[in-house]
């Protein structure tokens, strides 16, 4: 019951963010990466969403550079019902999540910048607002198993605090 209430409230907040975005922004072409400078365009997209959140009077904290969940605990009145938002950008139809998997407690705003092709249909610029659980769909169980395996290997080989093999390296940290 509590998780359902939290999810429903989060979905309403996210819909209001989507609606405000559509009211404020009609063209996303200014977010296109120029000359391979992805960090500049990423900062622009975060600033756009920040202006939407501020326009709605929402409170939030921002993640540091290269951390997941660009906006954490986004809320209006009740902080414990806050949502997490991750901003993604892509030119085509593939979204890269690097080392984090989508989950139902993260809402995604995906800027699809579009792509023109000579032979097949072009991909039009668009913005997708979606919950992480909708992204993973029926693959949820497999992804959970995958994440457990990855965490096991990270603990064994890469996390010194877990007292695994990483502590045995002499020339690597």
Give the label of every model feature segment.
Residues 1-80, 89-173:
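Nucleic-acid endonuclease domains
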């Amino acid at each position: 019951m509590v998780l359902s209430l939290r999810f429903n409230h989060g979905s309403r907040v996210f819909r209001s963010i989507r609606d405000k975005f559509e009211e404020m922004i009609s063209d996303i072409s200014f977010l296109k990466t120029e000359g391979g400078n992805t960090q500049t365009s990423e900062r622009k997209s975060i600033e756009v969403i920040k202006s939407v959140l501020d326009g709605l009077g929402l409170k939030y904290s921002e993640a540091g550079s290269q951390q997941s969940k660009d906006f954490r605990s986004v809320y209006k009145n009740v902080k414990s019902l806050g949502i997490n938002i991750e901003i993604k950008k892509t030119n085509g139809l593939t979204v890269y999540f690097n080392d984090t998997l989508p989950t139902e407690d993260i809402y995604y705003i995906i800027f699809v910048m579009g792509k023109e092709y000579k032979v097949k249909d072009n991909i039009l610029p668009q913005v997708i607002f979606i919950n992480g659980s909708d992204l993973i769909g029926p693959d949820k169980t497999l992804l959970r198993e995958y994440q457990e395996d990855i965490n096991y290997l990270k603990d064994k080989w890469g996390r010194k605090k877990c007292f695994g093999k990483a502590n045995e390296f002499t020339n690597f940290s």
